[in-house]
Amino acid sequence: MLRICSLAITMLLLFAHGAAAEPAGPAEVRVVFVRDGVFTSPTDSAWDEIPETNYALLAQQITPPIGGGSVSNVCVRATHDGDEIAFRLQWFDPSADRGVGVDTFRDAAAIGFPVGRPNVAPSPFMGDEAHPVVIWQWAADFDADAEGKSRFGERYPHAEGVWIFPQDLSVRRKVRGWRGADPVIEYISKGFGTLTPRMETTVEGASEYEDGRWSVVLRRKLETSNEVDPVFIPGTTSSLILAIWNGEEKEVNGRKAVTYQWIPAKLDGIGSPTAKADVGASNVRRE
């Protein structure tokens, strides 16, 4: 009888320990209310006043082509001013990869959001048939094109004397009203294999590569006229997922570093005081 009681107590203790050891969900991103407009520059020192949250990334192992994961950590900061919302992503990468060729790939980053405010969370793996997601993807080559930069010389450094274009794109960039390719593409997705680019994008992006680290800002109006869009309401919580591609490591398409759970993003109410950061941008972990 004593043996049975002892076994029962042991099982109860093991169950209790297992319940207590159940991993908690990811920490939330606080979307801080700012009064004077969101920060559009990735290197604006004002970002240092915004709390950061670091997220571990893992290789995509759900569907072919599996792989990636060379970037192990990304830092997220976010703000809104009642009119626009902005997210800044930072991660370490030993090289800035802006070229695309047969055997070269670009660096890129993406944030995914549920469409609308669903009662049931979509699959964190690019959504599902009943619950689509919208994905904002920034790519290093798009950003270079938008700025009118020439990537020909980067890829063929010894061929600058044989210029095949009528004029340098950097000159065209100075023309009033010039705008090249958007640095951000919006997609709609209902699961793996359904990724579809949208005809128009309402998201703007900017990037900076310095000291082995990418800093990327993605921003959008809080309200849009598109019903198939993420919804951001001050004082409420949305959610997001993250992905990073390292071109140097041949990461493209499904080969990427990702978060495997939805991350809560809590928007401050309008008029909330701006928080002081507990840690600065320099504390992004180098792994």
Predicted regions mapped to residue ranges:
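Bacterial N-terminal signal peptides
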Residues: 5-16
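Short amphipathic, basic-aromatic surface patches that mediate peripheral association
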Residues: 93-100, 226-227
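Long, low-complexity, polar/charged, intrinsically disordered or flexibly structured peripheral segments
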Residues: 150-209
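Exposed beta-sheet edge/beta-hairpin loop segments within beta-rich domains
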Residues: 205-212, 229-234
